[in-house]
């Protein structure tokens, strides 16, 4: 699990042990000699977003969060929904209209409430901020919450451990940039 690096993740205690679903330490395969590919689609919810979600939800569990909200257009929402389900935290994911029905089904499959918001992703974020003010929900924002990044940084620790060296170049998928 990525929590082999928990000492570097700014987490209190060992609540992560009850949250983790074995994310991290994904295989690295050689492609064309000097190019290596890290297989982060082999995470519990099929996305590198599990790295951040596992750590963020561990923090939420440690501080006693009962309900969270998040804006997402897909993978982060699925990951947060999954880890909240494992942790017993109520979860609402606000998605913009046009979000893949499969992503919505995955979010709901983990027991979270998926709410389609007319407009853009920014409108979803506005709804989440209002839920924080009105209901006291925790905003599990995967773009700005530093605990999400505490998890995604395990990517490079793993890469170093697996290759036994620092790669000369790293090319990563960006999405909205949460792994960068």
Residue ranges and their predicted role:
Residues 1-180:
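PLP-dependent amino-acid enzyme catalytic core
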């Amino acid at each position: 699990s990525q929590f082999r690096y928990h000492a570097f993740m700014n987490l209190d205690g060992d609540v992560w042990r009850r949250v983790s679903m074995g994310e991290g330490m994904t295989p690295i395969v050689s492609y064309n000699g000097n190019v290596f590919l890290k297989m982060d689609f082999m995470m519990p919810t099929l996305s590198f977003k599990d790295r951040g979600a596992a750590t963020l939800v561990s923090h939420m569990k440690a501080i006693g969060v009962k309900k969270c909200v998040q804006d997402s257009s897909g993978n982060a929402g699925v990951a947060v929904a999954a880890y909240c389900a494992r942790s017993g935290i109520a979860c609402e994911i606000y998605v913009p209209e046009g979000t893949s029905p499969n992503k919505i089904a995955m979010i709901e499959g983990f027991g979270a409430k998926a709410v389609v918001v007319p407009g853009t992703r920014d409108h979803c974020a506005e709804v989440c901020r209002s839920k924080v003010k009105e209901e006291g929900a925790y905003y599990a924002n995967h773009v700005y919450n530093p605990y999400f990044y505490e998890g995604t940084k395990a990517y490079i620790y793993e890469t170093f451990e697996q290759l036994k060296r620092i790669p000369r170049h790293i090319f990563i998928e960006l999405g909205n940039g949460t792994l960068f």
